[in-house]
Amino acid sequence: MATIKSIKARQIFDSRGNPTVEVDVHISNGVFARAAVPSGASTGIYEALELRDGGSDYLGKGVSKAVNNVNSIIGPALVGKDPTDQTGLDNFMVHQLDGTQNEWGWCKEKLGANAILAVSLAVCKAGAAVRNVPLYKHIADLAGNKKLVLPVPAFNVINGGSHAGNKLAMQEFMILPVGAANFKEAMKMGCEVYHHLKAVIKKKYGQDATNVGDEGGFAPNIQENKEGLELLKTAIEKAGYTGKVVIGMDVAASEFYGKDKSYDLNFKEESNDGSQKISGDQLKDLYKSFVSEYPIVSIEDPFDQDDWETYAKLTAEIGEQVQIVGDDLLVTNPKRVAKAIAEKTCNALLLKVNQIGSVTESIEAVKMSKKAGWGVMTSHRSGETEDTFIADLAVGLSTGQIKTGAPCRSERLAKYNQLLRIEEELGSEAVYAGASFRKPVEPY
């Protein structure tokens, strides 16, 4: 049996110039695997702990403690173990080596979710190589998923919120090519709409409005969220894809939710007089007006991460026609997912491996979501690396959807390009989620 020979971590940099953790795993039979973890800007308060150094170096964002935890604690403890035993290794790291818990489960406060996840991802890649199967196939086998599906890409083409220096409150305006025949065609549609959008924005707001945000989307200095939707609608029309390319939003509403329980759509304005503060119910009605006017199929984080009540109201009212996605609400945490299923809070999971901190717990959250009839969208973070693990994850778990930025910036394209390779490798077996993106496969 091939066993883990050595595990080594180092500090590298993400796409925002912040330190992050990378791990190398060497196996006794000569197999080598490497993985790096991403980092978010608009983070949910219930995410597992991302261990940072504090102090003045790297403005407090160094990860030498997390790196040291891998090199001195996790790595030595995993030497001699079987890299194909993902569940066993993840549980050993999370339950025994770390062991910290809070009301929502294993919180990784001792070793850091960034340390544990980097090892979890690298071990998963090594396990696939030891079994001599592609990573997506290994992940599918770990989850018990028999049918592989290529996801619909959700391209974040207009950036606002915490991802951009404009006044737009809502964070992401996305396009989803649901009418494409395959992933390759979906990329073509997405790229063409993106280029048309650039031309539309340049003509209306000038050259500097086509500067891009952290995820490669444009960040024109508009304030009206509806204007973002209007720009998308126009670009889709100009590209000739009306009806084939639809719209998704990530509002990231926790970013503009105040202590007075209001939502401030003008939260980025320094001389803010509070005139754009609205209640949860008013915001809910605003979404309903958007949905009636534009081809919106997905709304993520429409309310604050603790506003379960308004979430449930929106889901009850428009959940049939639009998926309501929990990101900050759920933080890929199986306990929070279970609560949301029971309370009918939302009807889709945003899958971010670094919110929970291990491959095994991520698979658990996805399986629960699918059994409840939910949609699942695999996601990058705004601070990314060139690592492509989530592309294989989306196919292996048949999530049906992936968002990993605009078709711009190499750390975003790395994932989309990997999906093109996977589709090519699957050949005639390749299935594209398309219009079935909310339920691409039966629960497994």
UniProtKB/Swiss-Prot annotation:
Enzyme class per UniProt: lyase
Coiled-coil segments on the chain, per record: none
Record flagged with keyword Lyase: yes
Claim: Lyase is one of the keywords in the record: yes
Residues that, per the record, bind Mg(2+): 250, 300, 327
CDD domains linked to this entry: enolase
Pathway participation: Carbohydrate degradation; glycolysis; pyruvate from D-glyceraldehyde 3-phosphate: step 4/5
InterPro entries: Enolase, Enolase-like_C_sf, Enolase-like_N, Enolase_C, Enolase_CS, Enolase_N
Residues holding substrate: 163, 172, 300, 327, 379-382, 403
SMART domains, alphabetized: Enolase_C, Enolase_N
Origin: domain of life: Eukaryota
GO cellular component, as recorded: phosphopyruvate hydratase complex
Required co-factors: Mg(2+)
Keyword entries, A-Z: Cytoplasm, Glycolysis, Lyase, Magnesium, Metal-binding
GO molecular function, one term: phosphopyruvate hydratase activity
Subcellular localization, as worded in the UniProt entry: Cytoplasm
Catalytic residues in the record: 215 (proton donor), 352 (proton acceptor)
Chief subcellular location: cytoplasm
Sequence intervals crossing the membrane: none
GO biological process: glycolytic process
UniProt catalytic activity: (2R)-2-phosphoglycerate = phosphoenolpyruvate + H2O
Family to which this protein belongs: Belongs to the enolase family.
Assembly, per entry: Homodimer.
Name this protein carries in UniProt: Enolase
Organism this protein belongs to: Solanum lycopersicum
Gene name linked to the record: PGH1
